[in-house]
From Swiss-Prot:
Official protein name in the record: N-acetyl-gamma-glutamyl-phosphate reductase
Record's subcellular location: Cytoplasm
Pfam families registered for this protein in UniProt: Semialdhyde_dh (PF01118), Semialdhyde_dhC_1 (PF22698)
Listed Gene3D superfamilies: Dihydrodipicolinate Reductase, domain 2, NAD(P)-binding Rossmann-like Domain
Pathway as given in its UniProt record: Amino-acid biosynthesis; L-arginine biosynthesis; N(2)-acetyl-L-ornithine from L-glutamate: step 3/4
SMART domains according to UniProt: Semialdhyde_dh
The protein's Enzyme Commission number: 1.2.1.38
Organism taxonomic ancestry: Bacteria, Pseudomonadati, Pseudomonadota, Gammaproteobacteria, Alteromonadales
PROSITE patterns: ARGC
One GO cellular component, as annotated: cytoplasm
Family: Belongs to the NAGSA dehydrogenase family. Type 1 subfamily.
Biological function: Catalyzes the NADPH-dependent reduction of N-acetyl-5-glutamyl phosphate to yield N-acetyl-L-glutamate 5-semialdehyde.
Active site (record annotation): C155
Principal location class: cytoplasm
Length: 337
């Protein structure tokens, strides 16, 4: 058994991690933590998340001393914390035997100037940044297997890259035309903190972060080409539906697209290649990525749709996939019945 601590267990992603760790046959939950100034410090996790009413776990406030002890006291640490906290704590947490899986955006972007532009604070943890491996589980398995620090991808990048990487990997994209990604996320993507934008009476379908969302440089860095990315807030709880329009190279056929996706995901049990365009209900509360595509050979434009649960594959279950890779278990262990 591998011991696991979760920092930031009060939020949606942290609570989902608690549930996944508890149901995993090879993991034991060593502790659940929040920051010292959290309003949820010393509360029961059952008090915050009714689906965990059966779980006897307290949200312990974490100190710098406790961080250092944790680094040598458990096998794995999940960070479901704000970007700034992950940035500041990583050198301590990664200094011991524990392997760290960070679900914030603090270590996804290697270019520190780009990071500061999109995240609003300077990145000074250069050693940890160099150490971090991007945890897109289906595409970076070899690097993940030997990593000590994992930067778990963002929710929108997970959906977008899952849709686009088979085309890029096979050289099928017309690089003179940027892929256009329109993606809609449920309000859980904004976290538990109350805000007018995500309140019941105010939430509606709306674009946000237009031509400036912080997931744009993340997608571009791991796709290898610029994109036009427009996220939308939807009036539902969970899930992301990303619809991607791309121009493929002249002469590309539907058979080539079929082969690209089949070859990429034939042995990837978390990715489901669908016969029709997926919907969010197909993936809500599951770890799956559902994909479908259609090509107009006359114009050279293809539309690819990816559906994921933003809290699962977009965060917590992908972190578990990475842990499974790191411990040489089947990637779907603890995730798929």
């Amino acid at each position: 058994m591998y011991s696991v601590s979760i920092i930031g267990a009060s939020g949606y992603t942290g609570a989902q991690l608690v549930q996944l760790v508890l149901q995993h046959p090879k993991l034991e939950l060593a502790g659940t933590y929040v920051s010292e100034n959290s309003n949820d410090a010393n509360k029961s996790i059952a008090e915050l998340h009714g689906n965990l009413a059966h779980v006897n776990a307290t949200l312990t406030p974490i100190s710098d001393t406790a961080l250092s002890e944790m680094a040598n006291g458990v096998d794995f640490i999940f960070l479901a914390t704000p970007h700034e906290a992950s940035h500041d704590w990583m050198p301590i947490l990664s200094s011991g035997k524990a392997k760290v899986l960070d679900l914030s955006g603090a270590f996804r972007i290697k270019d520190t100037a780009v990071f500061e532009q999109f995240y609003g604070f300077p990145h000074t943890q250069t050693q940890s940044l160099a150490q971090a491996v991007y945890g897109l589980a289906e595409w970076h398995e070899a690097q993940i297997a030997s990593a000590d620090v994992i930067a778990v991808p963002g929710c929108y990048p997970t959906a977008s890259l899952s849709a686009l990487k088979p085309l890029a990997h096979n050289g099928l994209l017309d690089e003179s035309v940027r892929p256009v990604i329109n993606a809609v996320s449920g309000v859980s993507g904004a976290g538990r903190k109350a805000s007018l934008t995500t309140s019941f009476f105010e939430v509606s379908l709306q674009a946000y972060g237009v031509l400036g969302h912080r997931h744009t440089p993340e997608i571009e860095a791991y796709l290898g080409t610029p994109v036009i990315f427009t996220p939308h807030l939807g009036n539902f709880k969970r899930g992301i539906l990303a619809t991607v329009t791309v121009k493929v190279k002249a002469g590309t056929t539907s058979a080539q697209l079929e082969k690209a996706y089949t070859d990429a995901y034939a042995d990837k049990p978390i990715v489901r290649l669908r016969k029709s365009f997926p919907k969010i209900d197909d993936v809500a509360h599951t770890p799956f990525v559902d994909l479908h595509w259609k090509l107009d050979e006359a114009s050279g434009y293809a539309v690819v749709t990816a559906a994921i649960d933003n809290v699962m594959k977009g965060a917590a279950s992908q972190a578990i996939q990475c842990l499974n890779i790191m411990t040489k278990q089947p990637i779907e262990t603890g995730l798929v019945l």
